[in-house]
UniProtKB/Swiss-Prot annotation:
Part of the ribosomal stalk of the 50S ribosomal subunit. Interacts with L10 and the large rRNA to form the base of the stalk. L10 forms an elongated spine to which L12 dimers bind in a sequential fashion forming a multimeric L10(L12)X complex. Forms part of the ribosomal stalk which helps the ribosome interact with GTP-bound translation factors. The keyword tRNA processing does not apply. SUPFAM superfamilies: Ribosomal L11/L12e N-terminal domain, Ribosomal protein L11, C-terminal domain. One or more lysine residues are methylated. The lineage of its organism: Bacteria, Pseudomonadati, Pseudomonadota, Betaproteobacteria, Rhodocyclales. Keywords: Methylation, Ribonucleoprotein, Ribosomal protein, RNA-binding, rRNA-binding. Pfam families: Ribosomal_L11, Ribosomal_L11_N. GO terms for molecular function: large ribosomal subunit rRNA binding; structural constituent of ribosome. This is Large ribosomal subunit protein uL11. It comes from the Bacteria. GO terms for biological process: translation. InterPro entries: Ribosomal_uL11 (IPR000911), Ribosomal_uL11_bac-typ (IPR006519), Ribosomal_uL11_C (IPR020783), Ribosomal_uL11_C_sf (IPR036769), Ribosomal_uL11_CS (IPR020785), Ribosomal_uL11_N (IPR020784), Ribosomal_uL11_N_sf (IPR036796).
Length: 143
């Protein structure tokens, strides 16, 4: 028989830096889950990723106080800002451009994000990422 699910917890946790402090501790503690067990498992899974890169994670909490978690790919905006070499997007994206990225960089980001995107093919994923970049005030060259 399947375990009874008592809830889902969605968090963004820096890769390799999960610790019991907020927001992880309170979110897991409310449901009676073992916080250190999650932190150790998450840090082990994110060992190969760039430290500090925010990773969205969905934790499924079960009635017997056990849990499973699914890691998603980093947010597109974080990857775009990193590729463009900027700290934040433009406050007026359609008038003030703050940086630019090439089509090759957009394709690389789309490849990374493909498992989480609803795009049917690579070209649709590239257009989705390019649209996100434009809405941040970043020019996409070659598109």
């Amino acid at each position: 028989m399947a375990k009874k699910i008592i809830g889902y917890i969605k968090l963004q946790v820096p890769a390799g830096k999960a610790n019991p402090s907020p927001p992880i501790g309170p979110a897991l503690g409310q449901r009676g889950l073992n916080i250190m067990e999650f932190c150790k498992a998450f840090n082990a899974k994110t060992q190969g990723l760039e430290p500090g890169l925010p990773i969205p994670v969905v934790i499924t909490a079960f009635a017997d106080k056990s849990f499973t978690f699914i890691m998603k790919t980093p947010p597109a905006t974080i990857l775009i800002k990193k590729a463009a070499g900027i700290q934040k997007g433009s406050p007026k994206p359609h008038t003030d451009k703050v940086g630019s990225i090439s089509r090759a960089q957009v394709e690389e980001i789309a490849k990374t994000k493909m498992p989480d995107l609803t795009a049917a093919d690579m070209e649709a994923a590239v257009r989705t990422i390019a649209g996100s970049a434009r809405s941040m005030g970043i020019t996409v060259e070659g598109l």
